[in-house]
């Protein structure tokens, strides 16, 4: 993609550009926001301003056009999740990038150096979404000790230009990251200082990196101390000098250390399962065939405690002639049902979508996106399965008060986990329950599913789900649902889950559901349910029974809660063989059965 590099002069924005080039992206321009003339630094939650006088030199160093804009706004909207706010400093960024687009209409993405700052990330993502661009944030959630070392070994020469933390003094100003690395790690152990300065402990100025055709040399520097005496920074003058040794950098050059797809824990799971388990050859066993899911004509509705559950929401017969019309009718019916309870689309926590064919995924999303086009939309799982009716879309959702909701909606591409550029959040936490969206084994940095090792894909998808859970600061694990497209993969999924729970010490059942297809032709989709860590007493716990239900197939699972919780209905797609188990989830209180998932045979009433 053609990329605009947002630069502050600091190490993070520059190092992210190195990752962009390593991944094959072409940086076509640079952009920077700076204080008004005569100001060395401003109090901004969003932008690094110290050292801004040197920024014009970066155009010559990169040999790229540089676009700049004065910061005229203030931090008016200080919520973590940003929405358009007049005179906010984020709107300065919007105007800047919009101006760049007029000169570079083929621009596709924006590079940003966000590591831990949700405040910064959500604002860049908001601007990118409004302008039809992607956000590339390859440093997001990276381990800071490793990241600091990666910067040093990659030839990024950055000096400390501001210090504002215990243990850092004016004597450290002007020192390089390489010179400061040991001290920063020592301060991390003593005082929990962020090694990469994510707590505002220090700021840097990049003098050279492999992408620079020329390097920056300081010609004068002056230490400026704040009135408190604990914060000081360098006011510098600089010039550009040639780099006779510089060689042109081609796209996909190895400018940064290789990023392993699997973390240590999941790499161990992968190698353990690979040694113990061989996928069944296609010729050795015939995959199980799916039986179409029977649908009821009326929607399932239950309001209990803090939650409302709506299931079996379909279009109105005779109200549509096209698939788009069916999608609009189904969503209108969902909206009407919500209205009868005094709710709107913003009250929805989680949505389960079943399509008759995954070929309709993009077309459905185009309609769905219009309905849930707001900050932090519901989390979601979407699968395809044959439906025993004329309907091609079935939806179920869990609903509640928005005042109790917090969300994770990361839209920038990174190495962390797949970006959710679609109309759903990675996770929603509400009323003590954390709903994780279904996760598939996409390679997050490129958002592609191009793995030829099915076990690796399954483990990677589980890692994605767990990383989302960690970012949500979840409590105890309640249950796991794994969708598979081939019945022969079920045993492997169970073994992976067993190894995962053994390593983590968590105890939770896994339910494996057979479907016709998953997004991107994935082999598995993991969907996790957690208690919120803020609850003194976990709302839900789980155990597996050996109850067996007989029937030609099973169609629905039903979850029941008492007045403190929810009744949840989501579609289960099973084959002709009956389930050999049921799952029971109970409140920690012995006399209160909070959640009971049961399988209902096709010919039984739900």
UniProtKB/Swiss-Prot annotation:
**What is the protein's species of origin?**
Schizosaccharomyces pombe (strain 972 / ATCC 24843)
Q: What does this protein do?
A: Amidase that catalyzes the last step of diphthamide biosynthesis using ammonium and ATP. Diphthamide biosynthesis consists in the conversion of an L-histidine residue in the translation elongation factor eEF-2 (eft201 or eft202) to diphthamide. Has a role in meiosis.
- Disulfide bond as a keyword of this entry, yes or no, is no
Q: Does this UniProt record's set of keywords contain Ligase?
A: yes
Q: Which GO terms describe its biological process?
A: meiotic cell cycle; protein histidyl modification to diphthamide; regulation of cytoplasmic translation
- Enzyme Commission (EC) number: 6.3.1.14
Question: Where does this one sit in the cell?
Answer: Cytoplasm; Nucleus
- Where does the protein principally reside? cytoplasm
> What is the protein name given in its UniProt record?
Diphthine--ammonia ligase
Q: Name one GO cellular component term.
A: cytosol
Q: What keywords would UniProt list here? A: ATP-binding, Cytoplasm, Ligase, Meiosis, Nucleotide-binding, Nucleus
Q: Which CDD domains match?
A: AANH_PF0828-like, eu_AANH_C_1, eu_AANH_C_2
Pathway where this protein functions: Protein modification; peptidyl-diphthamide biosynthesis
Q: Which Gene3D superfamilies match?
A: HUPs (3.40.50.620), putative n-type atp pyrophosphatase, domain 2 (3.90.1490.10), RutC-like (3.30.1330.40)
Family label: In the N-terminal section; belongs to the Diphthine--ammonia ligase family.
* Any one GO molecular-function label of the UniProt entry: diphthine-ammonia ligase activity
Reaction(s) catalysed (UniProt annotation): diphthine-[translation elongation factor 2] + NH4(+) + ATP = diphthamide-[translation elongation factor 2] + AMP + diphosphate + H(+)
